[in-house]
Amino acid sequence: MLTADFEVLDQRFAKLVFGNVYVEKLWTGSRWAEGPAYFPAGKYLIFSDIPNNRTIRFDETDSSVSIFQSPANNQNGHSVDREGRLIACEHQGRCVSRIEHDGTRKVLASHYEGKRLNSPNDVVVKSDGTIWFTDPTYGIDSDYEGDAAKSELGDQSNVYRLDPMSGELTVVASDFVRPNGLAFSPDESLLYIADTGFSHVTNGPKHIRVVKVNADGKTLGESRLFADCSFGCFDGFRLDTNGNIWTSAGDGVHCLAQDGTLLGKIKIPEVVANLTFGGPKRNRIYICGTTSLYSVYVNARGAVWPA
Ligand code: MG
């Protein structure tokens, strides 16, 4: 029997969750929780508390919570690269950075064609080690989540591909209003990108688009609308090994099938900004919900590992 924490809208969802399972509230105390990334080697989760300018570590072994970085350059989205290093989107730093194995911070990308990036928002690492990220203006729109500043790129909020070996930074998409969360399909033939442009444009997008990755693995092809958000907006999201999309929304986590059908919801009593799969079997979803960190076990596994 499913608890009231789940809402089944399509019977396929009933197979992706468990009976007698509840959402757990693990910790509270953030102003805007974002950017969860799970480190399987250390069994901990790193996530952002953007307005409080800190990153937080949840230790899965004893459920303790501690400060990881403070100040933290108003970091937003995170990912873990193929070498197990933390990749961070920095609002205040207006860059994508990496924590090296020796603990030092290295800026990987801060400018495009001589102009400062806006405020990198969310990031994913492809299996070839390249780093793909979005660069909307949220971190420079005000002093709340970074330092207010005028965009040097004009109104352009691009999606970028960074080769961390050569440092080459290329625009892979420039037709989003405010690109936000992003994630590849399990075979990396598709890239899903959220657009939260409704925040800046009347009746603007609050949807996810799906974009074909060209055969070169470096550029993007045609795109189409994947799903509109029915409550709030889609911010960050992850895919499971079967290609289902588990995405943040205004009323919790929405699970979408590959055809875009809303299969069901994990209900969270706060706006959710982002999530990631964790746990030793990567079947535990960690959920950043505004003031709190939540988690829930599901009958699905994260597609990318670590992430
Ligand atoms: Mg985001």
Each predicted region: which residue ranges?
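Sequence-structural signature of mature extracellular/luminal beta-sheet repeat domains
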Residues: M1-A307
